[in-house]
Swiss-Prot record:
It is found in: Endoplasmic reticulum membrane; Golgi apparatus membrane. Pfam families: Arv1 (PF04161). Mediator of sterol homeostasis involved in sterol uptake, trafficking and distribution into membranes. Also regulates the sphingolipid metabolism. The gene is arv1. GO terms for biological process: intracellular sterol transport; regulation of plasma membrane sterol distribution; sphingolipid metabolic process; sterol metabolic process. This is Protein arv1. Belongs to the ARV1 family. The lineage of its organism: Eukaryota, Fungi, Dikarya, Ascomycota, Taphrinomycotina. It comes from the Eukaryota. InterPro entries: Arv1. The chain crosses the membrane at residues 71-91, 122-142, 153-173, 179-199, 208-228. It is a multi-pass membrane protein.
């Protein structure tokens, strides 16, 4: 157990006085004199908001004071939920793109397949991209930093990837842009780096950043192969442009290729 404010080791997080969650007293950290874990008394909604805001305190609470063999199942369920949201986002964007470009064959060809096949294909791509990224990060942490606990590393990546659910609100309010998915993916990568640095207790942001970046490149290669096999690799039609706009488009393509996922592909 660790203090969420300073990261120092603590003997206990609270003192239990009787039945009910209100009959507890939060322990004080001897190092920083703050409450060791203020999130014990907060509900899931407030904790989720701090996770989206990438606060280091909530990462320490989840990774050091809450994560166990039992709670890791909930983390895996959360990962599956994110994948299901990804399927919804990709599917909705494909339908919008097919409506905007009725003569653009890749989207039309994919959407002409049976609905079950469409869903299973997108679900497979989303699950594979998540699994490949998770395995790559864990293996690289083990090989380069000697990290032993794969559950904590995987949990850190999953919990810090909750920002990926934000584009759902953009779809609901009809502000969905293709560049937004790429921006969100880069925010997720920075969040992963932050969470892994907190987990390992290391300030080597550059080294962990390279680990996350390399894992993202491996994921991009696998996703491109799957998109090529399903005929979705050329789903975004190119638009002619010149000058500064051409440079911006090339820059966007470069950043998108590093974080290629099913979301950024469409």
């Amino acid at each position: 157990m660790k203090c969420v404010e300073c990261g120092a080791e603590v003997d206990s997080l609270y003192t239990y006085y009787g039945r009910g969650t209100s009959n507890i007293r939060l322990a004080q950290c001897k190092n920083c004199k703050q409450f060791a874990d203020k999130y014990i008394e907060l509900d899931v909604v407030l904790i989720s908001m701090d996770v989206i805001l990438m606060k280091p305190q909530v990462y320490r609470h989840l990774l050091f004071n809450s994560l166990s063999a039992r709670t890791f199942r909930n983390v895996v369920n959360f990962c599956i939920l994110i994948s299901l949201f990804n399927v919804f986002l990709v599917w909705s964007r494909l339908e919008k793109r097919a409506a905007l470009f009725p003569y653009f064959t890749p989207a039309q060809a994919f959407l002409s397949q049976p609905i079950i096949r469409q869903y299973l294909t997108l679900l497979l791509i989303c699950l594979v991209e998540t699994t490949v990224y998770q395995i790559s990060v864990v293996l690289l942490l083990c090989l380069t930093m000697g990290w032993k606990s794969w559950t904590s590393a995987s949990g850190a990546v999953i919990l810090s990837s909750s920002t990926r659910m934000l584009p759902v609100f953009m779809v609901i309010w009809d502000y969905d842009l293709s560049i937004a998915a790429t921006v969100v993916e880069w925010v997720v990568l920075f969040s992963n780096v932050d969470a892994l640095c907190i987990l390992t207790g290391s300030r080597r942001y550059f080294k962990i950043g390279l680990i996350v970046l390399f894992a993202s490149l491996v994921r991009s290669i696998v996703v491109y192969i799957f998109l090529h096999l399903t005929g979705l690799s050329q789903i975004q039609p190119s638009t002619p442009c010149d000058g500064f706009q051409h440079f911006v488009n090339l820059l966007c393509v470069y950043f998108r290729s590093i974080t290629l996922t099913a979301q950024t592909a469409v």
